[in-house]
């Protein structure tokens, strides 16, 4: 064989090999606009929320739109948000989701938690479990993520709805909180403010700005959540019963204009974040790697970045972020992250779809 031809073939082969080795992901569900949340059904099909108000079932490489959704208020950051299965979904069939709704008092909308069942391609047995009030025409800070603990309590987050100076620090008001309910929507008897006069009994923690990532740590059973700061001051927190997480009294962030709204980054009696980002990365979506699919990455926390369009692999030492490594750089605005039943990590990316993170 001519030496030049041989060398040309070798260069092409090495280039292709290098490309295949450096490929970080493969697209599993293409052509999604804003996959705000997704979850895996027992048959490994995927239930996906699109922020503009669609629920999609992806099965056998085919998308089917689910009918029977409640009326969804789409404004600013609000719309159809997270979705999660009951831990005993195989036994009871319950699906839980959060969305913005105009129901209730006042103009505009606010975050709502509903449960329902899937019958064919239709939602049935729908029941609102919680509706934050009052409604607001502001377009920001609806939250919202959902997580279940081992006792089947459901936790869900609602942002401060742009009412920074009233909502987060007042337990008689909704918004700027993480809530806990029983799986049927009733209030757990050991909720922290159940005996406080005038308090919203579903509140589990308060002093939050806009939590858009929440997950039960599979190694410790703690509730981990992250939230958006303003200009700087995005946070990761470990959520504890009845605790105050400081917003807006204490923050590492400043106003978007560059002015300060507080000189304090910590206050006695309020919880400090275990990690914060300045400048902001605009975090959304969260998952722990608990499978063996990624080797030494097991135990890492994954956080999506809307602003900088990557996934941060947070390497943990105890309850601290020791180091961050950027994955899927420039992939697009990362909205949601889940570990599938197969142990692989799946990432929802705006204007792309859902991708599978490939082990190296």
Task: Please annotate each region the language model reported.
Residues 1-23:
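Bacterial Sec-dependent N-terminal signal peptides
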Residues 21-164, 213-216, 221-229, 279-317, ...:
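Acidic, Gly/Ser/Thr-rich repeat motifs that build Ca2+-stabilized beta-propeller blades
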Residues 65-78, 126-142, 183-204, 247-278:
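Surface-exposed loop and turn segments in beta-propeller and other repeat-based domains
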Residues 100, 228-234, 238-245:
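Short edge-strand/loop segments of extracellular domains
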Residues 111-121, 170-184, 238-240:
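Beta-propeller blade signature
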Residues 172-181, 190-223:
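Loop-centered beta-sheet repeat module
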Residues 210, 221, 230-232, 243-244, ...:
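Short, catalytically relevant binding-site loops at active-site mouths
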Residues 321-341:
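Conserved blade-ending motifs and adjacent loop-strand segments that build the rim/top face
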């Amino acid at each position: 064989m001519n030496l030049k031809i041989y060398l040309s073939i070798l260069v092409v082969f090495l280039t292709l090999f290098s490309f295949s080795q450096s490929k970080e992901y493969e697209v599993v569900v293409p052509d999604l606009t804003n996959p705000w949340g997704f979850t895996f059904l027992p048959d490994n099909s995927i239930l996906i929320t699109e922020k503009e108000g669609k629920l999609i079932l992806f099965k056998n490489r085919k998308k089917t739109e689910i009918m029977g959704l409640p009326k969804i208020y789409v404004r600013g950051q609000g719309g159809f948000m997270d979705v999660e299965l009951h831990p005993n979904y195989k036994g009871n069939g319950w699906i839980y989701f959060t969305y913005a709704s105009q129901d209730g008092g006042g103009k505009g909308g606010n975050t709502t938690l509903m449960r329902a069942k899937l019958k064919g391609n239709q939602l049935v047995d729908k029941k609102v479990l919680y509706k934050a009030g009052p409604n607001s025409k502001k377009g920001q800070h609806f939250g919202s993520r959902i997580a279940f603990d081992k006792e089947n309590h459901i936790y869900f987050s609602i942002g401060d709805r742009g009412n920074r100076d009233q909502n987060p620090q007042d337990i008689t008001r909704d918004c700027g909180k993480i809530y806990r309910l029983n799986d049927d929507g009733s209030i757990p008897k050991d909720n922290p403010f159940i005996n406080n006069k005038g308090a919203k009994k579903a509140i589990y923690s308060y002093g939050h700005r806009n939590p858009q990532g929440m997950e039960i740590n599979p190694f410790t059973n703690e509730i981990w959540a992250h939230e958006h700061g303003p200009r700087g001051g995005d946070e990761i927190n470990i959520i504890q019963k009845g605790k105050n997480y400081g917003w807006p009294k204490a923050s590492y962030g400043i106003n978007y204009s560059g002015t300060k709204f507080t000189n304090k980054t910590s206050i006695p009696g309020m919880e400090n974040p275990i990690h914060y980002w300045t400048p902001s990365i605009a975090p959304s979506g969260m998952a722990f790697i608990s499978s063996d699919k990624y080797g030494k990455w097991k135990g890492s926390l994954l956080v999506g970045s809307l602003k900088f369009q990557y996934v941060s692999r947070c390497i943990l030492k105890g309850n601290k972020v020791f180091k961050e490594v950027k994955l899927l750089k420039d992939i697009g605005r990362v909205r949601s992250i889940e570990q599938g039943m197969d142990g692989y990590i799946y990432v929802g990316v705006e204007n792309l779809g859902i991708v599978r993170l490939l082990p190296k």
